[in-house]
Amino acid sequence: MARQTDVRPIVRLRSTAGTGYTYVTRKNRRNDPDRLVLRKYDPIARRHVEFREAR
């Protein structure tokens, strides 16, 4: 069972293009205490957009 205080929790990255496409990744809470923002490819929008951490 995963603990709530896990150092590397699984986070869901949701597209800011409004397509509803998501990536699932893990992040290190010690290095990235804020919400994660990555620029990745959205296949529905067919371009690179910002993906923000959704909670």
From Swiss-Prot:
PROSITE patterns: RIBOSOMAL_L33
PANTHER family: 54S RIBOSOMAL PROTEIN L39, MITOCHONDRIAL, LARGE RIBOSOMAL SUBUNIT PROTEIN BL33M
InterPro entries cross-referenced by the UniProt entry: Ribosomal_bL33, Ribosomal_bL33_CS, Ribosomal_bL33_sf, Ribosomal_zn-bd
An example molecular function term from Gene Ontology annotations: structural constituent of ribosome
Listed Pfam families: Ribosomal_L33 (PF00471)
Family: Belongs to the bacterial ribosomal protein bL33 family.
GO terms of biological process kind: translation
Species lineage: Bacteria, Bacillati, Actinomycetota, Actinomycetes, Micromonosporales
Recorded superkingdom: Bacteria
Transmembrane segments annotated in the record for this chain: none
Annotated keywords: Ribonucleoprotein, Ribosomal protein
UniProt-recorded name of the protein: Large ribosomal subunit protein bL33A
Coiled-coil region(s): none
One Gene Ontology cellular component: cytosolic large ribosomal subunit
